[in-house]
């Protein structure tokens, strides 16, 4: 450490107002010096473990388990601590106990003959494991992670060695007393949760919490309780955020996707969205229509014929409303350049055809009872009334609004963190691999400036309630981020939803990807992006989601010689037959980067009862010769700045520029 140069008094004088404010927190040479010592010590601690997960798609059971087992980190810690001294079955049971302490304890109490003995052995093991996982943190940080009921006891046990002769009786008596007063179960639950918390210092969710899975609201509820998290919004997140902001086109899309996959639990049970008006509307207008192309796609769901018929009618009804609402945005925003997606006016109902890109296609469904051929994008009176009711439901759902505010507070379109660049979709590129310029609000933007602008507009969509014009533009932009040709979240030229419903020709269903995906394996592209985002190309990685890695076909998630890592989690069951696995997660600890591939998860019930974990295979991507310290991280840079400021404060005290507060007057 180099102390601040006392001769640079002009710098100190220039910052005197700030230093006087800082002196309120550190009112003496002694307190400022102590803090410098503390901060300098923290810099030399090992870097905390980061856990990267992407594309959860509402699959809450798989995600919950992944969160609890930290992509295998807890199992590896158990192996490190206990090695061959424990049988594999004992290690498995210990891991399951840490993941699901309440449920596992219920089972053990029913089957264990000598419960007190089991408690004693288990408590020793959990304390030993907790000592190891907490060893890279300061006592202060560990203390903050402890539950209030057991904070003092856990801290005592973590900081004492049970094999030390002079403290052995003290250590043992604590454990025996916990058992004697019938608090062992509560203590096991508490320390298991502490272990779960301490094994991961930072959680990164790289998009798509929402989609077709049944429990997005359960996932966000769990994430909102996490101690340290950031989120990079995905395309499915942004459409829900737009819906919560009141964007009617986003609301229609959210409902359509939910109906497409017969997943109404998130809407109805999770957020209390009333879909009865839509059901009534659909039965009135599509009563005689079997809506064959709108039958829900279901996995592991047993729906009766009556349910399927109703969902199909609702699905078609909201789809037509969606196309009308999207048409209004396209006409309102010519700068989006999406006129080719205006298809309702290209329908010839009499002939049963669609004029698409100057080519005539036969429609496989010609029943459009709400379509006015003179004004095809106008909602009829019943549709307008329905859209108003649905919009009110979304805007007035307390839980949905709370969850979306959480996404805004903890999320962004991209994140630079510890020399890594995290984003869900892509950075829009031209065919030649250069950054694509996009004109928004009369500004021509590309790369970082484009994403920064889109991030601001997404926030205006939700928060600018007193500026209707800015809010409307922001909401339109949320829809564009969902499906626009230059959206960094969508990453494709067009979304062919209409064609998939109404045309048989598979060629019309194709969605051409942005050239970014063609260049993902090119180190030069990665270097260009690193430079654009002001990152060191030699020591940085792009961590990406969105597109499932087709491992089954030999695709490698490691691109561009390790510069770009694709970790689409594969949580979505519909993708697993294509990918061959349940996707990838990433761990970045003080020793390097570990990429973990996962097999499909059975269920939480089987995990608890049978000890079934997610079968995972870990690849070491990078291994550093000397452990990374806090000083090598973004937090380290902030701490260095704090030390610099405190050193200036010390000089100000010693030169008499700021007077120390009398020790007797300092209130602790």
UniProtKB/Swiss-Prot annotation:
Pathway(s) the chain acts in: Carbohydrate biosynthesis; gluconeogenesis
Any one GO BP annotation for this protein: gluconeogenesis
GO molecular function, one term: fructose 1,6-bisphosphate 1-phosphatase activity
Gene3D superfamilies named in the record: 3.60.21.10
Cofactor section: Mn(2+)
SUPFAM superfamilies: Metallo-dependent phosphatases
Top EC class of this enzyme: hydrolase
UniProt KW keywords: Carbohydrate metabolism, Hydrolase, Manganese
Keyword Oxidoreductase: no
UniProt xrefs under Pfam families: FBPase_2
Catalytic activity: beta-D-fructose 1,6-bisphosphate + H2O = beta-D-fructose 6-phosphate + phosphate
Enzyme Commission (EC) number: 3.1.3.11
UniProt record similarity statement: Belongs to the FBPase class 3 family.
Protein name per the record: Fructose-1,6-bisphosphatase class 3
Phylogenetic lineage: Bacteria, Bacillati, Bacillota, Clostridia, Eubacteriales
């Amino acid at each position: 450490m180099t102390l601040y140069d006392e001769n640079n008094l002009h710098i100190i004088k220039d910052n005197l107002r700030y230093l006087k404010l800082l002196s309120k927190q550190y009112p003496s040479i002694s307190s400022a010096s102590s803090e410098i010592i503390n901060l300098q010590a923290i810099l030399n601690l090992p870097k905390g473990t980061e856990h990267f997960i992407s594309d959860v798609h509402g699959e809450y059971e798989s995600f919950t388990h992944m969160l609890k087992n930290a992509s295998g980190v807890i199992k590896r810690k158990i192996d490190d601590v206990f090695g061959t001294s424990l049988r594999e079955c004992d290690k498995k049971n210990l891991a399951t106990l840490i993941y699901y302490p309440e449920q596992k304890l219920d089972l053990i109490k029913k089957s264990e003959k000598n419960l007190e003995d089991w408690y004693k052995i288990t408590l020793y093991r959990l304390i030993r494991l907790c000592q190891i996982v907490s060893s890279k943190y300061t006592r202060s940080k560990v203390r903050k992670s402890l539950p209030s009921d057991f904070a003092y006891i856990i801290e005592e046990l973590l900081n004492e060695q049970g094999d030390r002769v002079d403290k052995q009786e003290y250590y043992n008596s604590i454990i025996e007393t916990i058992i004697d007063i019938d608090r062992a179960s509560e203590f096991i639950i508490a320390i298991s949760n502490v272990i779960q918390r301490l094994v991961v210092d930072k959680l990164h969710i790289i998009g798509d919490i929402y989609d077709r899975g049944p429990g997005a609201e359960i996932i966000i509820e769990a994430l909102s309780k996490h101690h340290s998290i950031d989120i990079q919004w995905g395309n499915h997140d942004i459409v829900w955020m737009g819906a919560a902001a009141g964007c009617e086109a986003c609301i229609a899309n959210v409902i359509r996707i939910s109906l497409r996959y017969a997943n109404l639990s998130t809407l109805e049970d999770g957020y209390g969205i009333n879909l009865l008006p839509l059901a009534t509307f659909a039965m009135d207008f599509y009563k005689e229509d079997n809506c064959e192309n709108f039958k829900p796609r279901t996995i592991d769901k047993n729906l009766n014929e009556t349910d399927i018929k109703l969902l199909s009618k609702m699905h078609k009804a909201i789809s037509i409303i969606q196309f009308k609402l999207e048409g209004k945005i396209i006409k309102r925003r010519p700068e989006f350049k999406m006129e080719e997606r205006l298809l309702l006016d290209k329908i010839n109902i009499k002939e049963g055809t669609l004029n698409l890109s100057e080519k005539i296609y036969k429609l496989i469904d010609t029943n459009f009872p709400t379509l006015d051929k003179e004004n095809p994008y106008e909602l009829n009176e019943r549709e307008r009334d329905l859209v108003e009711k649905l919009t009110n439901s979304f805007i007035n759902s307390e839980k949905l609004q709370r969850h979306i505010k959480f996404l805004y507070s903890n999320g962004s379109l991209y994140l630079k963190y510890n020399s890594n660049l995290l984003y869900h979709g892509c950075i829009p590129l031209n065919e030649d691999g250069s950054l694509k310029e996009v004109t928004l609000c009369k500004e021509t933007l590309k790369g970082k400036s484009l994403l920064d602008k889109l991030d601001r507009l997404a926030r205006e969509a939700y928060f600018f309630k007193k500026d209707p014009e800015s809010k409307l533009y922001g909401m339109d932009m949320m829809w564009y981020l969902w499906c626009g040709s230059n959206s960094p979240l969508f990453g494709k030229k067009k979304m062919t939803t209409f064609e998939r419903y109404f045309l048989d020709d598979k060629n019309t269903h194709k969605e051409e990807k942005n050239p970014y995906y063609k260049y993902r394996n090119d180190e030069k592209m990665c270097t260009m992006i690193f430079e654009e985002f002001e990152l060191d190309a030699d020591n940085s990685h792009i961590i990406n989601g969105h597109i499932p890695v087709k491992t089954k076909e030999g695709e490698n998630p490691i691109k561009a010689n390790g510069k770009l890592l694709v970790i689409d989690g594969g949580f979505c069951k519909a993708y697993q037959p294509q990918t061959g696995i349940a996707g990838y997660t990433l761990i970045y600890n003080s020793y390097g980067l570990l990429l973990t591939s996962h097999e499909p998860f059975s269920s939480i019930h089987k995990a608890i009862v049978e000890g079934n974990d997610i079968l995972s295979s870990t690849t070491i991507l990078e291994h550093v010769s000397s452990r990374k310290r806090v000083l090598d991280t973004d937090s380290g840079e902030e701490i260095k700045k704090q030390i610099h400021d405190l050193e200036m404060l010390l000089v100000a005290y010693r030169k008499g520029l700021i007077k120390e507060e009398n020790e007797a007057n300092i209130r602790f």
